[in-house]
Amino acid sequence: MAWISLEKAKKLEERFGYPKVSEGKGVLSVEVPKDKFIEFLTFLKEDPEYQFKMFIDLTIIDHGEKENPRFQGVVILFSPKNQERIIVKTWAENETLPTLTNLWKGAKWAEREAWDMFGIKFEGHENLVRMLLWETYPYHPLRKDFPLEGIKDTELPSLNETLRGENLEGLFNYDRMHTALPTMEDLEITQKKRMPVKTSQIVLNWGPLHPGTHGTIWFLFDLDGEYVKQCDIIIGQLHRGVEKLGENVNWQQFIPYTDRMDYIAAINENHAYVLAAEKMLGIEVPEKAKWIRTMMAELSRINSHLLWLGTYALDLGALTMFLYTFREREKIMDIIEGITGARFTINYFRIGGVFADLPYGALDAIEHLIKDLPQRINDYETLLTRNRVWLSRNKDVCVITEEDVYQYGLTGAVARGSGVPYDVRKIDKYDAYGEVEFDIPVGEKGDSYDRYLVRMEEMRQSIRIIEQCIAKLRKMSKDDPYFFQTPDEKKLKVTIDGRGMKLPAGETYASSDNPRGELGFYIYNKKDGLKAHRMRIRSGAFYNLQVFTKAIIGRPIADAITLLSTIDPVVGETDR
C-alpha cells in the first residue's frame, strides 16, 4: 500500500509544530495532541495538497493499566488524489475522544465499536450505544485486563439439574457459573436504544433469523406505510471475539481463525492476514508462492460472486439462476479441495508462502474450468441483464453516491459500483498483482443495477488474471520454492520445540481486495513477541453494511432485499 512520504509528513510537522512523525513497518503515522485532533484531521481532509478525504478505519490501542494515558486512538485515511494513506494517532485522555462523525459518517459505527470493546467515550456522538454486544453488558472485552475466557458472573444450572434435580457439581468439569448472557429484557433494552426516537407507530423487525438476511443480522425499520423513514441495524449475534483471539495466540496459530470470518471467501481472508505478518517481518515471498496465492485468491473471488449471484437472483424470484451458478461453483469447490484439502475453511496460505505446492494436474483442471466459464457468465447475463423484472427491481434503486464512498469508507464492488475505482490490488500491487493485466470495472449511477454489473465484470477480469497466473506457473519448475525458506534440520527442531516465530516491535497495516471489500489488518507490537499486542481487523463488510441505513431511506421496504444483496455482507466478517 502506498503511504504518505516522510518528506510530506515532515512538512506537516513544520507547518503545525505539534505532530510527531514516526515510521512503522512499511507505514507512516503522525501523533497529534487530543485538543488538536479534529483541527488536524480537517486540514488533512480539505487541504488541496493532501486530500485525505476517504475514511478507512478507526480503532483503539490499550497500552495497559500501568500507562497514563492508557488508551490511544488510531485513524487510517486514504487520499484518492495521491493514492496514499496515513495513520493519525492521539491519546484518549480521561478515556474520551472527540467524535469524527462530523467529518466522516463512517466513523459512527467505528466509534460505537470502540466504546463497546474499550469503553472509550466519543464526545458529540449522536447515539453512543454498543455495536456488537447487548446494551446491558457490563464489561469492555478488548481491554487488556479482561480475560480471554470472560468473567463468570452468571449462575447457569444445567438442564439435567433444572429438569431432574441432578447435582452435577464436580462432575464432567461442570461449572454452574457462566459468562454473562443476555435475557429477553436485555435485548428489548438494546432494541429501544438503537432507535430512541420513532417517526411513526410501525417499527418492523427483519431478522435476525430471516432467510432474506443470509445470516444473523437484525434490521429495524421505522415505516410510513411501506416506505422506510428510519433504519438501524443490530449486529453481533455471531461475534466471537476474533480480535481478542488474535492477541492471545501466536502468529501462525491465528491463520485458521481468519477462515472463519468471511467463510465464503476463506482464502482471501488468509491472504490479508499473511500480508500483514510478512510486512511486519520484512520478508519477501518466493515468486511461485506469489503467483499461486494470486491465482487462488481470484478463484475464490469467482466462487464468492457465483454464490452472491445465485442467492441474489433467488431472493428476487429467479430460482433457475441459483441452480446454474451452483453448478459452476461446485466445480471451483472441487478444485479448491483438491489443492488445499478443504472446501470451506481452507487454511492454505502461510506467513511466507503457501502450505503446499500445487498438486499434479491442478493447472489443467483450472484451465479447463476457465475455458467454459466466460460463456456461462454470458448465459447468466442473457437471462438477467435485460430482463424487465430484473431491471424494475434494480435500476435506479438505492443509489450510493461517490461522496458516500468517501464518507463511509466503502470498498470493493460497492465503491466501484458508485464510480470510484478503488482497488487495493492496483494500489498496493501485492503478490503478483503488479505483474498481471486487468481492468477495474466501475458503475455510473451507483444503483443496485450498477453493483450487479460490476460484479459480473469482476468475474471476467478474475478469469483474465487466472489465465496469466497459469501461463506463468507452467514455466516454473516443480522444485521452485513455494515458501520463503526451507528450514534445515536444526531450524526445524527449533520450530517444533519452540513456541513459534516472533514478530518485531512496531506497527503495520496491510490489506487485500476481497469479494466483500477491503479486509485490512492493523498490527501493533510494543516489543518483539509471539503474539500481537493489538490486532485490529478492518472489515470491508462491516463498513459497507453501514451505508444500508442511509441508502434505504425513502425506499419501499421491498427494496431492502435488493440493497442488502448488492452490498453482499457476510456476518462472520461483520461481527468478527
UniProtKB/Swiss-Prot annotation:
InterPro entries: NADH_Q_OxRdtase_suD, NADH_quin_OxRdtase_su_C/D-like, NADH_UbQ_OxRdtase_30kDa_su, NDH-1_subunit_CD, NDH1_su_D/H, NiFe-Hase_large. It comes from the Bacteria. It is an enzyme of class 7 (translocase). NDH-1 shuttles electrons from NADH, via FMN and iron-sulfur (Fe-S) centers, to quinones in the respiratory chain. The immediate electron acceptor for the enzyme in this species is believed to be ubiquinone. Couples the redox reaction to proton translocation (for every two electrons transferred, four hydrogen ions are translocated across the cytoplasmic membrane), and thus conserves the redox energy in a proton gradient. In the N-terminal section; belongs to the complex I 30 kDa subunit family. In the C-terminal section; belongs to the complex I 49 kDa subunit family. It catalyses: a quinone + NADH + 5 H(+)(in) = a quinol + NAD(+) + 4 H(+)(out). The lineage of its organism: Bacteria, Pseudomonadati, Aquificota, Aquificia, Aquificales. GO terms for cellular component: NADH dehydrogenase complex; plasma membrane. Its EC number is 7.1.1.-. It is a peripheral membrane protein. One of its GO terms (molecular function) is NADH:ubiquinone reductase (non-electrogenic) activity. NCBIfam families: PRK06075.1. PANTHER family: NADH DEHYDROGENASE [UBIQUINONE] IRON-SULFUR PROTEIN 2, MITOCHONDRIAL, NADH-UBIQUINONE OXIDOREDUCTASE 49 KDA SUBUNIT. Gene3D superfamilies: Cytochrome-c3 Hydrogenase, chain B, NADH:ubiquinone oxidoreductase, 30kDa subunit. It holds the Pfam family Complex1_49kDa. Residues 1-176 are annotated as: NADH dehydrogenase I subunit C. It is found in: Cell inner membrane. NDH-1 is composed of 13 different subunits. Subunits NuoB, CD, E, F, and G constitute the peripheral sector of the complex. Its main location: membrane. Residues 200-576 are annotated as: NADH dehydrogenase I subunit D. Keywords: Cell inner membrane, Cell membrane, Membrane, Multifunctional enzyme, NAD, Quinone, Translocase, Transport, Ubiquinone. This is NADH-quinone oxidoreductase subunit C/D.
